[in-house]
């Protein structure tokens, strides 16, 4: 069976991930006119820039959908977001600022839940708005086929007939008007935005040029913290975790994770927390640039890692970071539910996250400027008295440390012999200044 259909399968049911925007509206109407039977599926991901979710399926029916469904994905999305925080599943960082993989998390949820809904309706052909140059076309492909082994893919944006007729937004708008729908194009922004309740992605157009900065972006989850005219008073916030799960903000306990994430977004968003500018490697190995918002994810991540460093030992923390980066890349690649990802998730959640219980108090200021004010946990292995510089009882004595240092003589002697061995092999040069062979100064090389 052919998995990817290059031309419209007339007479057959086609499920389309319908956002209600110009692209998917024109595509749905065009497919109906060309003889297909379109079914529209809209994911409610708690997008901060969407005001009326219930209106989206109604518009789909007006444009010719045989049926239209709104699928509430928020609970599952937040569950996956919390799992990512527990595992540190983030691999893209620049200057200490993290991209929280909010788009890959959204695709993992959308790609599985929408295709599952289609399968319930007997719809085994799926189309979405992802382009052939991006990451999402592969993410949706993988998640769709994982959910429904019989799935076929039809994307109007890969169909030359569709492209020839409606290849641009102007043509799509004219097509909608000609068909009796007063569809006006929204005002073109200097960049494209995609969002869910975990975060927002701003990319493309002017942001493809590296001399266009974050200052051209209008945040949809936060504030312009770089604009000194925007007043942002400092604010204290306390985050509580129980066994790796965020349960309370500022003393308020949440039984609903969705409400908890919305409140975390509001708190972090008031300061522009979690906004970053990243150059990343797409799945196809080409570099792209995005500006990201994730105020709630950032707030929870900061508090979680503060507890992590106070509770776990050095090797466990190192494994958390190493495995987390691996898992973050798998998530980015659309492999969040692959066996290698599940193996990493299980270990990190079972042995690391389960011990993260306690409270962290922060002072948030502008952007990613914050201070940690207090850290409290019954599980802390940080004990101030162990290494106090003040006189008093200690768990070990000066003689104990002398013995420990004496044992180091073994590997120090081995290292010294190795250095002179490298010098004999010509890999290092002798140094009269230190008495040890050294790497030759590159400034002197060739003189």
Swiss-Prot record:
Q: Which Pfam families match?
A: Arginosuc_syn_C, Arginosuc_synth
Which reaction does this enzyme catalyse, per its entry?
L-citrulline + L-aspartate + ATP = 2-(N(omega)-L-arginino)succinate + AMP + diphosphate + H(+)
Q: Which GO terms describe its biological process?
A: argininosuccinate metabolic process; L-arginine biosynthetic process; urea cycle
Involved pathway(s): Amino-acid biosynthesis; L-arginine biosynthesis; L-arginine from L-ornithine and carbamoyl phosphate: step 2/3
Q: Where is coiled-coil annotated? A: none
Q: Which residues bind L-aspartate?
A: 131, 135-136
Q: Where does L-citrulline bind?
A: 99, 135, 139, 192, 201, 203, 280
> Which EC numbers does the record give?
6.3.4.5
Which keywords describe this protein according to UniProt?
Answer: Amino-acid biosynthesis, Arginine biosynthesis, ATP-binding, Cytoplasm, Ligase, Nucleotide-binding
| Keyword Transmembrane listed | no
Check the record and name the SUPFAM superfamilies matching this protein: Adenine nucleotide alpha hydrolases-like (SSF52402), Argininosuccinate synthetase, C-terminal domain (SSF69864)
Q: Which GO terms describe its molecular function?
A: argininosuccinate synthase activity; ATP binding; protein homodimerization activity
Organism's domain of life? Bacteria
Q: Where is the protein situated, by its record's location annotation?
A: Cytoplasm
Record: residues binding ATP:
17-25, 43, 129, 131, 136, 194
Q: Which GO terms describe its cellular component?
A: cytoplasm
| Family the UniProt entry places it in | Belongs to the argininosuccinate synthase family. Type 2 subfamily.
Assembly: Homotetramer.
Q: What is this protein called?
A: Argininosuccinate synthase
Native organism is Salmonella dublin (strain CT_02021853)
Organism lineage: Bacteria, Pseudomonadati, Pseudomonadota, Gammaproteobacteria, Enterobacterales
Name of encoding gene: argG
């Amino acid at each position: 069976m052919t998995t990817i259909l290059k031309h419209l399968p007339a007479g057959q049911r086609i499920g389309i991930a319908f956002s209600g925007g110009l692209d998917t509206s024109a595509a749905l109407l065009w497919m109906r006119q060309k003889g297909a039977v379109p079914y529209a599926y809209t994911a409610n991901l708690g997008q901060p820039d969407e005001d009326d979710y219930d209106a989206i399926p109604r518009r789909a029916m007006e444009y010719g959908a045989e049926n239209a469904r709104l699928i509430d994905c928020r609970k599952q999305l937040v569950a996956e977001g919390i799992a990512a925080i527990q595992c540190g599943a983030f691999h893209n960082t620049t200057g200490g600022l993290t991209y929280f993989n909010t788009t890959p998390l959204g695709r993992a949820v959308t790609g599985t839940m929408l295709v599952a809904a289609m399968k319930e309706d007997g719809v085994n052909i799926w189309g979405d708005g992802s382009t052939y140059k991006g990451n999402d076309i592969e993410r949706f492909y993988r998640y769709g086929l994982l959910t429904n082994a019989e799935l076929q893919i039809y994307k109007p944006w890969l169909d030359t007939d569709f492209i020839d007729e409606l290849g641009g937004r102007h043509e799509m708008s004219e097509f909608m008007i000609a068909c009796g729908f007063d569809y006006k194009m929204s005002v073109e922004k200097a960049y494209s935005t995609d969002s869910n309740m975990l975060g927002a992605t701003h990319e493309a157009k002017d942001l493809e040029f590296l001399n266009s900065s974050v200052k051209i972006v209008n945040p949809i989850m936060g504030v312009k913290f770089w604009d000194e005219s925007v007043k942002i008073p400092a604010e204290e916030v306390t985050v509580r975790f129980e066994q790796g799960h965020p349960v309370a903000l500022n003393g308020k306990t949440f039984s609903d994770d969705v409400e908890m994430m919305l409140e975390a977004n509001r708190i972090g968003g008031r300061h522009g927390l979690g906004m970053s500018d990243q150059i990343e490697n797409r799945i196809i190995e080409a570099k792209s640039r995005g500006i990201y918002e994730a105020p709630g994810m950032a707030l929870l991540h900061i508090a979680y890692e503060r507890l992590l460093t106070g509770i776990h030992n050095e090797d466990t923390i190192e494994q958390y970071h190493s495995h987390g980066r691996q898992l973050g890349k798998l998530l980015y690649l659309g492999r969040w539910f692959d066996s290698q990802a599940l193996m990493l998730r299980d270990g990190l959640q079972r042995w690391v996250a389960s011990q993260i219980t306690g409270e962290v108090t922060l002072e948030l200021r502008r952007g990613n400027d914050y201070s940690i004010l207090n850290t409290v946990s019954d599980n802390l292995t940080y004990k101030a008295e162990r290494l106090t510089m003040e006189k008093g009882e200690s768990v070990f004595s000066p003689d104990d440390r002398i013995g420990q240092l004496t044992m180091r003589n073994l590997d120090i002697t081995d290292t010294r012999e190795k250095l002179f061995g490298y010098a004999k092999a010509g890999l290092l040069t002798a140094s009269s200044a230190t008495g040890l062979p050294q790497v030759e100064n590159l400034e002197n090389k060739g003189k």
